[in-house]
Amino acid sequence: MSNRDTLFSTPVANLGDWTFDERVAEVFPDMIQRSVPGYANIISMIGMLAERFVQEDSQVYDLGCSLGAATLSVRRNIKASGCRIIAVDNSPAMVERCRRHIDAFRADTPVEVIEADIRRVPIENASLVVLNFTLQFLRPEERQQLLNTIWQGLKPGGALVLSEKFSFNDADVGELLFNMHHDFKRANGYSELEISQKRSMLENVMLTDSVETHKQRLKLAGFQHAELWFQCFNFGSLVALKAGHA
């Protein structure tokens, strides 16, 4: 059972930029369920995608794994044998807790949890790569290179799951979905103070792209097929496929 997120329920004098530190890791499951609409659905459906795409004797990468929710969903649903999951995060607090979460569940598929910069991790023999609300924390000029690396490391017939918060070219649509997201957070018990303080901390470190921009990058990386498979307000997930057969 995770602790309830009350990190920003009182005024913070010097907010600074957002970091995934010990305090955030401690309340992260509650925070993300109450902040990201559709998160639980995305996690469970990543497991369904894993059942379809993970190939025999291949590797799965969960880049920006946080506490390992996507990794556990993948591991529960893998039917192929001889696979290995590599879960990567650059937050020591997240990695420590992720290892504990993974170790709490028995399964045949081994998981290696690595504390590292996802931009420096080689992608090899991969049949599935998960980027779950991670790319948006890289500088925009670094995003294409990571997608290129992922495509190069994927086996033919492999897939990338890319979940992100989106911006919108249509300002009216963007404003509506932005407001709906805030309604969602209010309905989940967050106060105006909590919402505004968190937004202030995130605005310099989480820079969102439109779905169109994501699709353009994926095409440039080499993915011949990429489409939005899930969306709730201004959050969603794309699946990108590498051509060929396993």
Swiss-Prot record:
Residues given in the record as S-adenosyl-L-methionine binding sites: 39, 64-66, 89-90, 117-118, 132, 199
The organism of origin for this protein: Erwinia tasmaniensis (strain DSM 17950 / CFBP 7177 / CIP 109463 / NCPPB 4357 / Et1/99)
Protein name: Carboxy-S-adenosyl-L-methionine synthase
Protein EC: 2.1.3.-
Enzyme category, top tier: transferase
GO molecular function: carboxyl- or carbamoyltransferase activity; S-adenosyl-L-methionine binding
Gene: cmoA
Family: Belongs to the class I-like SAM-binding methyltransferase superfamily. Cx-SAM synthase family.
Function: Catalyzes the conversion of S-adenosyl-L-methionine (SAM) to carboxy-S-adenosyl-L-methionine (Cx-SAM).
CDD domains, A to Z: AdoMet_MTases
A single GO BP: tRNA wobble uridine modification
Subunit structure, interactors included: Homodimer.
Record field: catalytic activity: prephenate + S-adenosyl-L-methionine = carboxy-S-adenosyl-L-methionine + 3-phenylpyruvate + H2O
Keywords linked to the UniProt accession: S-adenosyl-L-methionine, Transferase
Pfam families found in the cross-reference section: Methyltransf_25 (PF13649)
